[in-house]
Amino acid sequence: VADLQEAVGTRENPIAIPGICGIKIFMGVSTGTLLVSDKTALERIFTETAGLIAVHAEDEDRMAERRKLIEGRTDIAAHAYYRDDITALMATKLSVELAHKTGHRLHILHLTSGIEADYLNDHCTLPSMADGYPIITTEVLPQHLTFDETDVDEHGVRLQMNPPIRYAKDREILWQRLVDGTIQCIATDHAPHTLEAKSKGFPEAPSGMPGVETSLPVMLNYVNQGRCSIEDVTRWMSTNVADC
């Protein structure tokens, strides 16, 4: 915690090192060994630091148990099965609980499931519209607004990412919650890998997809299809991002 305080400050002295906008916490393993899953450690970070906390919300203990259920499987469907929506919801609920307990600013990264989006309907708002604390915001990726299990079945590990591409029902609820304002922003979680690395197949292939260069064209396609307006895209990818 001391290193984090030096980087982002404390409640009493909220001065961050220039260029550091906050703390990202992996509540479940995704990239390398980056992980803070212990509730006591998480509460210390929420209590003793300043600035924004952004969380990759997957419950590590549940994920570890469910990983045992797919031992020996090489089909890509196993990825979303063991990193399921309850795994994500548990971590999202914990982060919201800690934000309410401490009053800390919270941003929940790359929302993927319908049950999370519905749960956050009562918790998220733009900072400029907030009436008190905590201020909680969230985001969604074009990948999760576009793909579902049929695409994963067709394209395999090229669509493998964490948290995973889920199901058509999740995609539709994410759209609903983006339009109604529960979700404030469009992000990308840009994490490209070579085709050589992806060719290893599941579960050895790395998780991650490109996103920066495709995000705006994908969203403009939705404008052309009538799913949203250009003003919506401007809010989700520009003004709301600045607000957050």
Label for each model-derived stretch:
Residues A2-I186:
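Histidine/acidic residue-rich metal-binding segments in metalloenzymes
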Residues T74-G103, R158, V179-D180, C185-I186, ...:
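His/Asp/Glu-enriched, well-ordered alpha-helical/loop segment
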